[in-house]
Amino acid sequence: MRITIFGTGYVGLVTGTCFAEVGNDVVCMDVDEDKIARLNKGEIPIYEPGLEELVQKNHKAGRLRFTTDPDEAVEHGAFQFIAVGTPPDEDGSADLKYVLAVARTIAERMDEYKVIIDKSTVPVGTADRVREQVETVLRERGADLPFDVVSNPEFLKEGAAVKDFMKPDRVIIGTDNPRTKELLRALYS
């Protein structure tokens, strides 16, 4: 399956690499040009046992690519994962500006059905805000395109993230669309 991951931090890099390891075609997108340049050389910005070898192996095999180009990223994946930071806001709540910015980026560029999947650590109700953002942009564009939004929180422990992803004790798929639920089940099977 063709997958795009927005964000190459801990969650995004582990998720993208592990999806590539099981045979998917993955593009990871980040705005940090230096980080993408290092990833394209096989150097990873975090320490996670086994991750660097998997990045190098899958990058060499062509199943894992890294880019700063949002056009390439949106065009590539039927599955668009949002795995960006949600730093604390002034009141301590999660600041969703990066999540909503990615939703806008996807909506501005999509030209076919997309499943937009939120992997970031976010509060309840964020999927509704992502959906509203995408609907607003599509309306501004005059585009009537189908899409679904899914909440798919991660449960990765540092030091065991690759193992946790490859053999999860649970996978949460939050969606109101049975078809989308089956697409995600197939992706994780």
Whereabouts are the PLM-identified features?
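Structural/interface elements that position substrates and couple domains in central-metabolism enzymes
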Residues: 1-189
